[in-house]
Curated annotation (Swiss-Prot):
InterPro entries: Class_I_gatase-like, GATASE, GMP_synth_C, GMP_synth_GATase, GMP_synthase, GMPS_ATP_PPase_dom, NAD/GMP_synthase, Rossmann-like_a/b/a_fold. Its EC number is 6.3.5.2. GO terms for molecular function: ATP binding; GMP synthase activity. It catalyses: XMP + L-glutamine + ATP + H2O = GMP + L-glutamate + AMP + diphosphate + 2 H(+). Pathway: Purine metabolism; GMP biosynthesis; GMP from XMP (L-Gln route): step 1/1. The active site is at C90 (nucleophile), H178, E180. Catalyzes the synthesis of GMP from XMP. It is an enzyme of class 6 (ligase). This is GMP synthase [glutamine-hydrolyzing]. Keywords: ATP-binding, Glutamine amidotransferase, GMP biosynthesis, Ligase, Nucleotide-binding, Purine biosynthesis. Residues 13-204 form the Glutamine amidotransferase type-1 domain.
């Protein structure tokens, strides 16, 4: 299995140098909100490799370490000599200070959480016109006590005598606080000013330009005669990926919808109707429900489930290829497989240097090593909101682009325990009720997604009618998010929760308890498995 490096078709990136920050991906996303392309790289990347990426600017992220710790992440001084704009945040601010001859002190004055930032008389470009003070989010122990030579101190706090500085001549600046988080209300404007005014970058990373670049990239990868096959899951990612490839190579793309039996109620019909109507793409639907259930028989370990589903999905594709080839010119083959892999998928699967593997993602690590296709992943560098924007640019209807995320392995990873037909029917019924009530309450635009999970290996004691019951609990997992990198549990009104619980326990056999998951991400991932 081979893949093309999609970064080759991207514009010059704003590189976020990750020093172990919790919010490194969020920084990249905030940069993209300014319509600039951004990637995250580890602080261990050699300076020559960083230079080879031809960065438009560098942002040095925060991190949990003290610059005085023996194992503190180091900043390669050569990065400050590349001649590109540099912006330091929190730990990156301190590392930048040390590398350029300033002073970082152990003041003993720690600042965590909301802090009042005092703007100096020389406010500089970043804080000009923002008043004498503003609320920011701090998380530091050490503080910069003296700025490097040539830098102007523009802000301070009680615990940080130098909380921000700038050097317009070098196109460098830094802040002790976290401008990327919502708890710093003016932080995004500060970041925007650095990128557009101090760094002088042109904001060209728009939905229209992204779509054009990706279409051209796909044409280049597949060529003038190559043929591709794309698996549709019913979700926005695969639909947008397929629409991009369809725009690039036309009828040389065949979309395959594998009904693996792990779908929610009505999903097969929705794909066959909505997607074909929107794109005019060729669609082949194959019924593989029995094959998937056989592969999942007796499998309870989450990773084993993902691997089994991924492996069988590819085998289903290979069986479908024979039918696709029947309509192809004599002697031709299908060599390319289109996937809707997103940037968070790659990050969670440890796809970047220095990242930990959280779980194998169904679009990244769940494929067999002997897969016979070359992967086409046009969305690999995009966040979910960017995918939706590209989908709208391509003319896909809201029913597709606004659809809540649904994992490729489907309900298979929302059943905690062995996957059986009876358990699927139970979960399908509960899920349909939850979705219907959330829609009726007008919460579709509030909730990022709401996984409904069946604890199939748990028996809960209950009383229904005049008898004692031993049913299964259902877990509701509503979350709010911007890009799935982080998420907070959604505060659904109690009356809506009551309706969902009452209907599920009354209408779904085998369920006698409904519980609410109130865990944010981190520490918990959105899906249970």
């Amino acid at each position: 299995m081979t893949q093309q490096d999609p970064a080759a078709a991207a514009p010059r990136p704003v590189l976020v140098v990750d020093f172990g920050a919790q919010y490194a991906q969020l920084i990249a996303r905030r940069v993209r909100e300014v319509n600039l392309y951004s990637e995250v790289i580890p602080h261990t990347m050699p300076a020559d490799e960083v230079a080879a990426k031809n960065p438009a600017a560098l942002i040095l992220s925060g991190g949990p370490s003290s610059v005085y710790a023996d194992d503190a992440p180091s900043l390669h001084p050569e990065l400050l000599e590349l001649g590109v704009p540099v912006f330091g945040i929190c730990y990156g601010f301190q590392a930048m200070t040390q590398a350029m001859g300033g002073t970082v002190a152990k003041t003993g004055l720690r600042e965590y959480g909301r802090t009042e930032l005092q703007i100096q008389s020389e406010a500089g470009v970043l804080h000009e016109g923002m008043g004498e003070s503003q609320q920011v989010w701090m998380s530091h122990g050490d503080s910069v006590s003296e700025a490097p030579e040539g830098f102007t101190v523009t802000a301070r706090t009680e615990g940080a005598p130098v909380a921000a500085f700038e050097c317009p001549e070098k196109r460098m600046a830094g802040v002790q606080y976290h401008p990327e988080v919502l708890h710093s209300p003016k932080g995004q404007e500060v970041l925007r000013r650095f990128l557009l005014e101090t760094a002088g970058l042109e904001p060209t990373w728009t939905a229209g330009n992204i779509a054009e670049q990706l279409i051209e990239q796909v044409r280049e990868q597949i060529g003038d005669e190559g043929r591709a096959i794309c698996g549709l899951s019913g979700g926005v990612d695969s639909a947008v990926a397929a629409a991009l490839v369809q725009r690039a190579i036309g009828d040389r793309l065949t979309c395959v919808f594998v009904d693996h039996g792990l779908l929610r109620a009505g999903e097969r019909e929705q794909v066959e109707k909505d997607f074909v109507a929107a794109t005019g793409a060729k669609l082949v639907t194959v019924d593989e429900r029995e094959a998937f259930l056989q592969k999942l028989a007796g499998v309870t370990e989450p990773e084993a489930k993902r691997k089994a589903i991924g492996a069988e999905f590819i085998r289903s594709f290979e069986r479908a290829v024979a039918g696709v080839l029947a309509d192809a010119p004599e002697g031709s083959s299908v060599d390319f497989l289109v996937q809707g892999t997103l940037y968070p998928d790659v990050v969670e699967s440890g796809g970047g240097t220095g990242t930990a593997n959280i779980k194998s993602h169904h679009n990244v690590g769940g494929l067999p090593d002997d897969v016979e296709f070359e992967l086409v992943e046009p969305l690999r560098l995009l966040f979910k909101d960017e995918v939706r924007a590209v989908g709208r640019e391509l003319g896909l209807p809201e029913e597709i682009v606004a659809r809540q995320p649904f994992p490729g392995p489907g309900l298979g990873i929302r059943i905690i325990g062995e996957v059986t037909e009876d358990r699927l029917e139970t979960l399908r019924a509960a899920d349909a009720i939850a979705r219907a009530e959330l829609t009726a309450a007008g919460l579709d635009d509030v909730i990022w997604q709401c996984p409904v999970v069946l604890l199939a290996d748990v028996r809960s004691v209950g009383v229904q009618g005049d008898g004692r019951t031993y049913g299964h609990p259902i877990v509701l997992r509503p979350v709010s998010s911007e890009d799935a990198m982080t998420a907070d549990w959604t505060r659904i009104p109690f009356d809506v929760l009551e309706k969902i619980s009452t209907r599920i326990t009354n209408e779904v056999e085998e369920v006698n308890r409904v519980v609410l998951d109130v865990t944010s991400k981190p520490p918990g991932t959105i899906e249970w498995e």
